[in-house]
From Swiss-Prot:
Stated family: Belongs to the peptidase T1B family. HslV subfamily.
GO cellular component, one term: HslUV protease complex
Database matches in NCBIfam families: ATP_dep_HslV, PRK05456.1
Protein name: ATP-dependent protease subunit ClpQ
Binding residues for Na(+): G165, C168, T171
Originating organism: Bacillus subtilis (strain 168)
Annotated EC: 3.4.21.-
Keywords: Cytoplasm, Hydrolase, Metal-binding, Protease, Serine protease, Sodium
Gene name per UniProt: clpQ
Enzyme class: hydrolase
GO process annotations (BP): proteolysis involved in protein catabolic process
SUPFAM superfamilies in the record: N-terminal nucleophile aminohydrolases (Ntn hydrolases)
The protein's assembly and partners: A double ring-shaped homohexamer of ClpQ is capped on each side by a ring-shaped ClpY homohexamer. The assembly of the ClpQ/ClpY complex is dependent on binding of ATP.
Amino acid sequence: MSSFHATTIFAVQHKGRSAMSGDGQVTFGQAVVMKHTARKVRKLFNGKVLAGFAGSVADAFTLFEKFEAKLEEYNGNLKRAAVELAKEWRSDKVLRKLEAMLIVMNQDTLLLVSGTGEVIEPDDGILAIGSGGNYALAAGRALKKHAGESMSASEIARAALETAGEICVYTNDQIILEELE
């Protein structure tokens, strides 16, 4: 078992808070659920940064380690660490073959980092990746827009993942939720 073939990660910045959620399902191949409670969202850099991944397990752990090293190297500068990781990921012969995507965030910044060298900061403070990403993204945008002050970032992150889990067969309801205050 070497791959998270299907996963949903969702991140939102709302009312001065940052939250990220991920489901726990690990699917092997196209038909077998191998695990229900995988932890695909983590706190890094002494709890000041959240990171979530979709993609191959070993590749994602390699990228977590590389990203955390870049955070240390650049004293917690999230944008600089993400750009430097993307540059290395794209240009290194071994890293270039890694199959994963990352969402990283701190209190001020939310970024998507991919192996093609892209570092994308969304306009609306919301990102989602993985098989249920589009469902979570749509739900999260609607919740953020219409819930206004009545929902917290954590509540939006949880509800977006719950919605994705109701629609996407590769997303379950075992939600891991992390928040920065």
